[in-house]
A protein has these predicted regions:
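Gly/Ser-rich catalytic/binding loops embedded in alpha/beta enzyme cores
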Residues: 2-170
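Glycine/threonine-rich beta-strand-loop-alpha-helix active-site module
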Residues: 168-180
Length: 180
């Protein structure tokens, strides 16, 4: 699938293409990885890969997001075997061992994790500029912040890397990036 067509479709439309057999889940995953390669060097939204063997789960073709690529916020995502470094040099190398309810539900919905998004250290800032990974830039204005703490997720979706990404909010972590 070409990147422009891919970036113009939302998660439900991509899942519908998979259900109709017009594109395979593997093709969508490969397209998402190409989108990361094409865009991420400019905005720094994605800070780590999720290998295909870890990100892809066998789900029913009837799952609402069957085959749709998405990105995990690098903060308490609950995917076993996947690094979760929490935007911090202190978290470098930490690997989740247990699966969270969130992780299980994402997998059951058919989402395919292809990477991890940038977040401020421990999610404690309204701007995604961790020392560990560097700043995430707003894809609409490269001179501006992407906000935070879900700035990597917001920038990745806005730039067309994936149609859907894990984000969380306790004090504006989704609302701040969406308002910028």
């Amino acid at each position: 699938m070409n990147l422009d067509d891919y970036a113009g479709l939302d998660a439900l439309a991509l899942a519908d293409l998979v259900r109709k057999g017009e594109v395979s889940a593997a093709e969508l995953e490969e397209t998402a990885r190409r989108a990361i390669d094409a865009v991420n060097g400019t905005i720094n939204a994605v800070v780590g890969d999720v290998p295909a063997a870890e990100g892809r789960e066998e789900t029913s073709a009837d799952a609402v997001f069957h085959g749709v690529p998405f990105l995990l916020k690098d903060l308490a995502h609950g995917y076993p075997g996947v690094p979760c470094e929490m935007g911090s040099r202190l978290g470098a190398g930490y690997i989740n061992e247990a699966e969270s309810v969130y992780g299980a539900r994402c997998k059951a919905s058919g989402l395919v994790a292809v990477g991890r998004t940038n977040t401020p250290e421990f999610g404690l800032s309204g701007s995604t500029e961790p020392v560990a990974n560097g700043p995430t830039l707003n894809p609409w204005d490269l001179g501006a912040s992407a906000g935070g703490s879900s700035g990597g997720a917001a920038a990745a979706v806005s730039a067309g890397i994936v149609p859907i990404a894990h984000a969380s909010d306790a004090g504006g972590s989704i609302r701040i990036p969406s308002s910028i």
